[in-house]
Amino acid sequence: MQRLFPALWVVLFLVVSPLHAEPKVYGEQRIHRWWDAVTDDIAQTWEQPDRYDLYLPFLSWHARFMYDKEKTDNYNEMPWGGGLGVSRYNDEGNWSALFAMMFKDSHNEWQPAMGYGWEKGWYLDNAKDFRLGLGAAAGITARDDFANYVPLPFIFPLFSAGYKRVTVQFTYIPGTYNNGNVLFAWLRLGF
């Protein structure tokens, strides 16, 4: 009887477990599901925003260890400009936004950027006033020093810290020596 009991459990497990198994998702199906989730999120953010946002860029710091001093001495690191956007938070505290910004780049030339941002959010208190976020932004930008404003796609990481409707967001623009490697930051005010 003692041997029969474990054997019975094994047989029961082998018979019942396939009934609850989900089909595996591979390659194209996984990409299709991901793409549908992103496009649905973009549509919902556009059609049902929680907030209208004002963007105020305030920092474009060039990593000194990746630049010659002569270059950084002449760069603009105060990217005056602004932007507008729509955003929403889901039930888990994740943030989604559509945005457009215009600011002065490192060479003091105007640079537009528009796109979609998403962040996984973590609240630091029960009142949900303090929030940290980590995610990505994707979109289109253009620069004077790159083929006279030919549109350039971008995907950059996003980091944020916020209190109620005021958030500081950062991204890091990777690059090579004397090019890129910029910490870009802006203030986002939600209305």
Curated annotation (Swiss-Prot):
Pfam families xref list: PagP
Active site: H62, D105, S106
Site feature: Role in lipopolysaccharide recognition: K71
EC number(s) on file: 2.3.1.251
Catalytic reaction annotation: a lipid A + a 1,2-diacyl-sn-glycero-3-phosphocholine = a hepta-acyl lipid A + a 2-acyl-sn-glycero-3-phosphocholine; a lipid IVA + a 1,2-diacyl-sn-glycero-3-phosphocholine = a lipid IVB + a 2-acyl-sn-glycero-3-phosphocholine; a lipid IIA + a 1,2-diacyl-sn-glycero-3-phosphocholine = a lipid IIB + a 2-acyl-sn-glycero-3-phosphocholine
Compartmental location: Cell outer membrane
A single MF term (Gene Ontology): acyltransferase activity
Record carries keyword Transferase: yes
Site (Role in the phospholipid gating): Y177
GO biological-process terms attached to the record: lipid A biosynthetic process
Enzyme class: transferase
Cellular component, GO annotation: cell outer membrane
Subunit (UniProt): Homodimer.
Family listed: Belongs to the lipid A palmitoyltransferase family.
NCBIfam families reported for this sequence: PRK11045.1
Function: Transfers a fatty acid residue from the sn-1 position of a phospholipid to the N-linked hydroxyfatty acid chain on the proximal unit of lipid A or its precursors.
Protein name: Lipid A acyltransferase PagP
Source organism of this protein record: Enterobacter cloacae
Lineage of the species this protein comes from: Bacteria, Pseudomonadati, Pseudomonadota, Gammaproteobacteria, Enterobacterales
GN (gene name): pagP
